[in-house]
From Swiss-Prot:
UniProt source species: Dinoroseobacter shibae (strain DSM 16493 / NCIMB 14021 / DFL 12)
GO MF: DNA binding
Protein family per UniProt: Belongs to the SfsA family.
InterPro entries: SfsA (IPR005224), SfsA_C (IPR040452), SfsA_N (IPR041465)
Gene3D superfamilies reported in the protein's UniProt record: 2.40.50.580, 3.40.1350.60
Name of the protein: Sugar fermentation stimulation protein homolog
Any coiled-coil regions, as ranges: none
PANTHER family: SUGAR FERMENTATION STIMULATION PROTEIN A
Lineage per the UniProt record: Bacteria, Pseudomonadati, Pseudomonadota, Alphaproteobacteria, Rhodobacterales
Record-linked Pfam families: SfsA (PF03749), SfsA_N (PF17746)
Length: 244
């Protein structure tokens, strides 16, 4: 997934509600307001003074001139904060058969109705193979070592998706929860039960039913975000308690 226009560097002033942020452009010193496409907690990714990357908006119908896309991390690493990006990245990867566990599927449909008033992110079908329901989750929390963690706050919706996928398995289909780590300084994934114990319980129940838990990293630069390598999932690993 490539960004539509070249990104510009800025310094974050503040993120003052779920969808708005202020930043100072590095090149001009102008303070601008930018759309923050992330309703989550964004732990460690919204500190004043952090170097961020904004995408200029050339659509006159939009109210804000910039959209916040990336946070620059230590040692040259990057984190993507746009929660719409994972579905785009995974959609491109599925179409290119780049996800090993799903490479046998030739037909991919997005936003297909299923379950109870839900839409699955992707439905993969192929003659002779079970229909596969794929949900995608954005991951960008890191608190210790090289562990990515999910979720970064309570997600009732996320637990519902796990239950819906479990029901698909019980109905004879295949179901996959795919966690996409949108930061380049993590090499493995674990749950964060201290932040949402209900989600951890839903994860265990879904996995016991047969829902497959996959995780992939990403390659991130100021040009875009693409699929990286498969990462191990270790839900039993102990997350740190109440650290920012």
């Amino acid at each position: 997934m490539r960004f539509q226009t070249p990104l510009v560097p800025a310094r974050l002033v503040r993120r003052y509600n779920r969808f708005l942020s202020d930043a100072v452009l590095e090149d001009t010193g102008e303070e601008v307001r930018a759309h923050c496409p992330n309703p989550g907690a964004m732990l460690g990714l919204k500190d004043a003074g952090q170097r961020i990357w904004l995408e200029p908006n050339d659509d006159p119908k939009k109210k804000l001139r910039y959209g916040w896309r990336l946070v620059e991390l230590a040692d040259g690493h990057m984190a993507g904060i746009d929660t719409s990006v994972p579905n785009k990245v995974v959609g491109e990867a599925l179409a290119a058969r780049a996800i090993t566990e799903l490479a046998a599927y030739g037909t991919i449909r997005a936003e297909v109705k299923y379950g109870t008033n839900s839409r699955v992110d992707f439905l993969a079908t192929e003659p002779g193979l079970p229909d596969t329901y794929v949900e995608v989750k954005n991951v960008h929390l890191r608190r210790a070592e090289d562990w990515a963690e999910f979720p970064d706050s309570v997600t009732t919706r996320g637990a519902k998706h796990l239950a819906e996928l479990a029901r698909m398995v019980e109905a004879g289909h295949r179901a996959v929860m795919l966690y996409l780590v949108q930061r380049t300084d993590c090499t493995r994934l674990r749950l964060a039960p201290d932040l949402d114990p209900s989600y951890a319980r839903a994860f265990d129940a879904a996995r016991a039913t047969g829902v497959e838990m996959l995780c992939y990293g990403t390659l991130i630069d100021t040009g875009g975000v693409t699929l990286g390598r498969a990462l191990p999932v270790d839900p039993a690993a102990q997350a740190p308690q109440n650290e920012d």
